[in-house]
Each structure stands twice: as C-alpha cells, then as structure tokens.
C-alpha cells in the first residue's frame, strides 16, 4: 500500500532533513535509518485528508521501512511484501512514478502535411495541451496516438472535425485540410515509413489525377490503407516462403533442429495472424457503423453541409475494397496455420509409429530371451550333482536337448502369435466378430430350412 503526499509538504520535509543530517552525524546516529516524518511534530493548525492520516496514523512503522524522500518521488511505501529488499522497493517506487511528471513526455513529435501535400513541419515537437486545444481532442484520443505506448490493437476513431488512425506503423490525425503524422519510435528511418510519407505527399496533391474527385481526407485514408495492406502482404510472403520451405524439408527428414525452427516460425505466424485479424475487424466495425461512415466526410462537414447518415457510398466502397484485401491475407495465413497443424499431427503420428516399432522390436528380443530361459531351465536341472537315472542312457543327451529346444521354440512361437494379435487394431472386438459369424451361420440354416419346406 502506498500513500501519495503533497509536493510542497515532501519538499519541505526534504529541506529540513538535509539541515538536520549534519547534527545527527555529530551524534553518531545513522541518517539512512531515521524516518523523515519523525523530524516534525504535529502541526499546530488542523490537517485534512491524506496529511492528517499521515501524521496521526495509529500504526507506526519501524524506521528501516520509511525511505528518505528524493526529488520527483513522492510515493512513500508504508508496507511491503515479506522478504522485500531495498533495491526492489526502489524499483517499485520508480515504476509507480507517473511519467507525466517528466517534462519531455509533455511533447509529441509529428510531421505535418498541408492541403497541397507539402511537408510544413518535419518531426516537429508540439505540446500535448496545444494539440488537444487546437484540434478539439480529448486526452484519451491522444493516448491512442501516443508514440510511447506500444499498442498492438489498431483503432480508427471518427471525431467531429478529425479522424484518428492507429494502424501498424502509421499513427495519424486526418483533418479536412491537414494531416499530422506522428513519429513512431524505431520507424523514422525505416523504408516502409519513408515510402509511405512519399506516397502520402503524392496523393494529397491537388494535381494528382489518379485519385479522381476524392476529397482530401479520402485520399489520405487510401494512402494509409495502401501502405498498411502492402506491409501486411510483404510480411505474409516472407512467412509463407520460410514456412513452406521448412514443411518441405520435414517431408524428407524429421530433424529436431527443423522442428525447433518450425516452432519459432509458428509463433511468429500466430502473432502476424492476430495482427491482420485485428486490422480486418477494425475495418469491419467501421463498416457496420453508419454514423462513423458519414462522419468521414470532413470536407463537406467543414463547409457546413454534413452528409446524411445513409449517404456514404464512396467511402463504403473504399473500405470494402481494403477489407477484402485484408480478409484475403487472413484466410491465406489461416490456411498456412492449418498446414502447420496438420504437419505437426503427421509428425506426431510418425514419431509414435517409430516408437511403437522400437517397442515391438524390444518385445521380440524379450520373447526370445524368455524362450531361451525356458530351455536353459531344463539344462540347469540336469546340471546339478544329483542322480537323474539317465546318466548311462544312450539317448539321454539327445532327449533332453530335444525337449529343451522344443520348449524354447514353443514359447517363442506362442508369444509371437499373441504379439501379432495385439498388434491388430480393429474397430470391433473379437467377441463382436464371433457373434456376427454365429448370426450369419444361423441365418443360413434358417434360409436352408425355409427353402426345404417350401419344396
């Protein structure tokens, strides 16, 4: 449990602690183990809220459990788990410190495209509050585009005068005459991001005749979907090529290293399938909402002529086109996942068959050893220094040897026959087969008797 105290009160305690520490050193006391709360007497004026609970708490903790406050850290641990070390406590305090206290987290880096497709600001830094007030957004809307948050869930949000998009490597804010492309960490120098920015600037130009009469926001949307589908298609081809090569190699030889490689690629393919499925679902969800489809026409809304709720045929056709592309990618990857699962099942069957073959061979050796043990048992009986009354017999040796050999052969043949019967795997048991055979014989007899009586 942690209690958050006010900033002014914590800084005041810190200054007083700093002033008293030299006096404590002269007295030979340890300042690290002395709680800073004990340096102050209860205030003369009444306290309220958390400060009152802090000064007049009925449970007092030992000095070793109260840490020395540091600037920027105002979370004081009151209790901790058993066996908690000071290092773990410090890490917990640092992780619980809100990142909004840091000044650099109040800035957002983004590139701005104007109505002609030209870059007016390249990787500029803007304050969050400035973006929220200027574009009429809420803090929760900006969090969807926060470059510091590694979110795998894609989003397409339609607001009154803007469209928020978070798809793969693209996080953008589209307006009727402007596009803000937020910088994503680790993708500023990537080839995909560079190609997308070039294609976006080209499609936003008014002189571009290939886009037809689409409004500004539709051209930006199409450029974003083209980049997203191209990235998904390229990644799908890589996964397909690698996994098909592994599956073809497994058909020739089943190796542990190949199976391990298949496991790694299967995990990557599952993650890619989830990513593509989420993108397809977010487009499908947008297609099912007529209000959002009509709200995508930002240019007409800015001119004071918003579209009716059921008047969105152009943007619906645009979204359906890329929905089909994304669904095709999902189906292709799903078939590849099914091939991997089928291959895994076949490999397991082959390994089980090999294991059964080894067990069968081991049983044969054991049966042979059992037969030899039966023959040597007779030999051991005649090896004792006792009279057996056939010492002087001419046929004694041959008779004993023959009996031992016949016993050995009989044991081996009997158990091998039993092993072959166990190996037969049928859908019906032997009892059902015998009953079916008896029923067939009885039916034949009844038919024969019926024919004889009719004559």
From Swiss-Prot:
Cysteine disulfide links: none
Short motif (YGMN): ranges: 382-385
Cellular component, GO annotation: mitochondrial inner membrane
Stretches with biased composition (Basic and acidic residues): 433-444
Region (Disordered): 433-455
Gene Ontology molecular functions: magnesium ion transmembrane transporter activity
Keywords: Ion transport, Magnesium, Membrane, Mitochondrion, Mitochondrion inner membrane, Transit peptide, Transmembrane, Transmembrane helix, Transport
Cellular localisation: Mitochondrion inner membrane
First and last residues of the transit peptide: 1-56
Gene Ontology biological process terms, A to Z: mitochondrial magnesium ion transmembrane transport
Domain of life of the source: Eukaryota
Membrane topology: Multi-pass membrane protein
Record flagged with keyword Iron-sulfur: no
Record-linked Gene3D superfamilies: 2.40.128.330, Magnesium transport protein CorA, transmembrane region (1.20.58.340)
Transmembrane segments: 365-385, 396-416
Subunit details: Forms homooligomers. Interacts with MRS2.
PANTHER family for this protein: MAGNESIUM TRANSPORTER MRS2 HOMOLOG, MITOCHONDRIAL, RNA SPLICING PROTEIN MRS2, MITOCHONDRIAL
Its biological purpose: Mitochondrial inner membrane magnesium transporter required for mitochondrial magnesium homeostasis. Modulates the conductance of the MRS2 channel. Involved in the splicing of mRNA group II introns in mitochondria by affecting mitochondrial magnesium concentrations, which are critical for group II intron splicing.
Family: Belongs to the CorA metal ion transporter (MIT) (TC 1.A.35) family.
Protein name: Mitochondrial inner membrane magnesium transporter LPE10
């Amino acid at each position: 449990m942690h209690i958050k105290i006010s900033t002014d009160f914590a800084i005041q305690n810190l200054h007083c602690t700093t002033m008293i520490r030299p006096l404590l050193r002269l007295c030979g006391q340890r300042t690290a183990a002395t709680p800073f709360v004990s340096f102050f007497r209860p205030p003369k004026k009444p306290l309220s809220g958390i400060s009152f609970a802090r000064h007049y708490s009925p449970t007092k903790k030992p000095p070793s459990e109260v840490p020395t406050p540091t600037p920027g850290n105002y979370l004081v641990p009151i209790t901790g788990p058993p066996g908690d070390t000071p290092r773990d406590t410090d890490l917990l305090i640092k992780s619980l410190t809100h990142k909004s206290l840091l000044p650099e987290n109040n800035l957002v880096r983004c590139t701005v495209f104007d109505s002609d497709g030209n870059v007016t600001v390249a990787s500029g830094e803007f304050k969050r509050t400035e973006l929220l007030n200027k574009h009429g957004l809420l803090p929760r809307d900006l969090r969807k585009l926060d470059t510091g948050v590694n979110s795998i869930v894609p989003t397409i949000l339609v607001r009154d005068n803007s469209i928020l998009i978070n798809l793969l490597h693209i996080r953008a804010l589209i307006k009727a005459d402007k596009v803000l492309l937020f910088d994503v960490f680790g993708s500023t120098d990537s080839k995909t991001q560079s190609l997308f920015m070039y294609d976006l600037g080209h499609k936003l130009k008014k002189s571009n005749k290939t886009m037809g009469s689409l409004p500004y926001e539709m051209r930006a949307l199409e450029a974003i979907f083209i980049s997203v589908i191209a990235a998904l298609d390229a990644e799908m081809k890589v996964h397909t090529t690698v996994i098909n090569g592994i599956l073809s190699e497994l058909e020739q030889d089943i190796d542990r290293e190949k199976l391990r490689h298949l496991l790694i690629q299967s995990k990557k393919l599952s993650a890619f399938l989830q990513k593509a499925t989420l993108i397809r679902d977010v487009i499908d969800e947008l297609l099912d909402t007529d209000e959002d489809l009509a709200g995508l026409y930002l240019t007409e809304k800015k001119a004071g002529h918003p579209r009716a709720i059921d008047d969105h045929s152009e943007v619906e056709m645009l979204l359906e086109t890329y929905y089909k592309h994304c669904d095709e990618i999902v189906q292709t990857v799903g078939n590849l996942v099914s091939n991997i699962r089928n291959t895994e099942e076949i490999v397991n069957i082959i390994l089980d068959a090999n294991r059964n073959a080894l067990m069968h061979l081991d049983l044969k050796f054991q049966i042979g050893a059992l037969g030899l043990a039966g023959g040597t048992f007779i030999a051991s009986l005649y090896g004792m220094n006792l009279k057996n009354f056939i010492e002087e017999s001419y046929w004694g040796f041959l008779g004993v040897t023959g009996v031992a050999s016949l016993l050995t052969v009989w044991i081996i043949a009997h158990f091998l026959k039993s092993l072959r019967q166990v190996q037969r795997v049928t859908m019906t048991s032997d009892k059902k087969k015998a009953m079916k055979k008896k029923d067939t014989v009885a039916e034949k007899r009844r038919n024969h008797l019926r024919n004889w009586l009719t004559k």
